[in-house]
């Protein structure tokens, strides 16, 4: 019975407030990768949205979930660490550098 309780505790989805904090971490990480809120890459809304979408898809693929609020509690710490280290793809990084360098030229 204790095994069942432990299993349920670890497999239970995270609290909605924790899911919200993960979304905030994602936003902060993506904005930082884009070069900040004043960067041309962030100002290009269509491009910025695609980077946010890429980040979301990467996260959901990594944890094999369809929605943030379905993340099992046992992965809560790993999810936080994920957003601290997430990086866009190489092609996306090159586009960010191109957009941000263009404004400095």
Outline where the language-model segments fall.
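A general nucleic-acid interaction/assembly signal
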Residues: 1-105
């Amino acid at each position: 019975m204790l095994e069942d309780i432990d299993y349920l505790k670890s497999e239970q989805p995270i609290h909605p407030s924790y899911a919200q904090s993960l979304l905030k971490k994602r936003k902060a990480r993506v904005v930082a990768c884009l070069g900040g809120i004043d960067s041309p890459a962030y100002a290009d809304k269509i491009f910025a949205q695609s980077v946010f979408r890429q980040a979301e898809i990467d996260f959901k693929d990594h944890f094999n979930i369809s929605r943030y609020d379905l993340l099992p509690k046992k992965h809560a710490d790993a999810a936080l660490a994920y957003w601290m280290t997430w990086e866009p793809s190489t092609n996306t990084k090159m586009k960010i550098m191109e957009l941000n360098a263009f404004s400095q030229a």
